[in-house]
Amino acid sequence: MIFHQFYSILILCLIFPNQVVQSDKERQDWIPSDYGGYMNPAGRSDEERQDWIPSDYGGHMNPAGRSDEERQDWIPSDYGGHMNPAGRSNEERQDWIPSDYGGYMNPAGRSDEERQDWIPSDYGGHMNPAGRSNEERQDWIPSDYGGYMNPAGRSDEERQDWIPSDYGGHMNPAGRSDEERQDWIPSDYGGYMNPAGRSD
């Protein structure tokens, strides 16, 4: 029974490793990556951080010790493979970038016009449903977590106030000025990207 309780607590700690409220300075070191690990492990310098940013699905965006040229060939895509398979030209790379949820952002051999209609959105459908005009497309781009980035029929000014943030709230709460907006953009994982009153 004691061992059962111990392992239950251990599992909870692994699932919720950073529930304690951190200060702003600590938060910078504790921003979780999308799928485990931290974007800047606490205590690491800026130079080390560049080498330790985990990719979304394993590995690191810049494996430690690699040059900028090598890094370009080693950035893992979100769902397997690499955004630029080593040795491929820029032209080939454009055709080989996997989309987030299957297929390719530009299926090999498709024209730019066709590509615009075939980029899958992150959560189903397409960013520009085939056959829609650019104006209609602007109203139909699904947001990452429900709704639409520009609800159909809203003006550009209204759209700015209605873009949902990735995890609740809005990137620019309606009625706030550009200066206030900078202080109110929610971060992806709680808090705000620029806490109110802080300098740039």
From Swiss-Prot:
Compartment(s) of residence: Secreted
Give the keywords, sorted: Amidation, G-protein coupled receptor impairing toxin, Secreted, Signal, Toxin
Phenotype upon changing Y192F: Increased potency on delta-type, mu-type and kappa-type opioid receptors
- Positions carrying Alanine amide are A42, A108, A152, A196
UniProt GO cellular component terms: extracellular region
Q: What is the effect of changing Y104F?
A: Increased potency on delta-type, mu-type and kappa-type opioid receptors
Q: Which GO terms describe its molecular function?
A: opioid peptide activity; toxin activity
Tell me the domain of life: Eukaryota
Q: What is its main location?
A: secreted
Q: Where is the signal peptide?
A: 1-23
- Coiled-coil regions in this chain? none
Propeptide segment residues: 24-34, 45-100, 111-144, 155-188, 199-200
Q: In which tissues is it expressed?
A: Venom gland.
Note whether Ligase occurs among the keywords.
no
Q: Where is this region: Disordered?
A: 30-200
Briefly state the protein's biological role: Synthetic BmK-YA activates human opioid receptors in vitro, with highest activity on the delta-type/OPRD1 receptor (EC(50)=2.5 uM) and lower activity on mu-type/OPRM1 and kappa-type/OPRK1 receptors (EC(50)=17 uM and 30 uM, respectively).
- Name the record gives this protein: BmK-YA precursor
